[in-house]
Amino acid sequence: MLLLVGLGNPGKRYAETRHNVGFMIIDAVARGFFFPEFCSKHDALVSIGNIGTHRVMLMKPLLYMNRSGTSVLSCTSMHKIAPEHITVFHDDVELQPGTIRVKLGGGSGGHNGLRSIDSAIGKAYWRVRFGVGRAELCNLSDYVLSDFENIAQVTDLVNSVAANLQMLLDGNAAGFVSKVTSV
């Protein structure tokens, strides 16, 4: 089984913020591949379904960003999911808006959600970085917890990530990035 984790914060207040783009992607995947309704497990919302030939668990941790690793560890321990079968979708302020990068392993880049997951399961999992840019005159925390200016454009990119996800799961990361960013 593969585990796809979207990072974000629970609650309507954060629903369309930059920091919640991981949740947005997981929701788009669930809709696009007709996953069953999410249920509460592992201090997260989870749903299990199929993407092509892959059995997949979708996860949205509910412990807030800086404790996401607790949910991921609980799930991976129970279901015996190896780190290389985990893909985490998250915002990245170091990438320009509309930019997507895929990487196996690496550091947290100052992202508290990744830092939490790194300390819980190590660093050998896949990351899909979703560029949200950085506001020069704004506190970083305030910036990532603020709503996107153009949610329609973000929604198009999020839907493109979901629509092309099977390519990534089949091992074609370069093709996935190329297809998603051509939107």
Swiss-Prot record:
PROSITE patterns recorded: PEPT_TRNA_HYDROL_1, PEPT_TRNA_HYDROL_2
EC number per UniProt: 3.1.1.29
Active site: 19
Positions marked as site (Stabilizes the basic form of H active site to accept a proton): 91
Protein name (database record): Peptidyl-tRNA hydrolase
Organism: Anaplasma phagocytophilum (strain HZ)
Binding-site positions, tRNA: 14, 64, 66, 112
Disulfide bond sites: none
PANTHER family, per the entry: PEPTIDYL-TRNA HYDROLASE
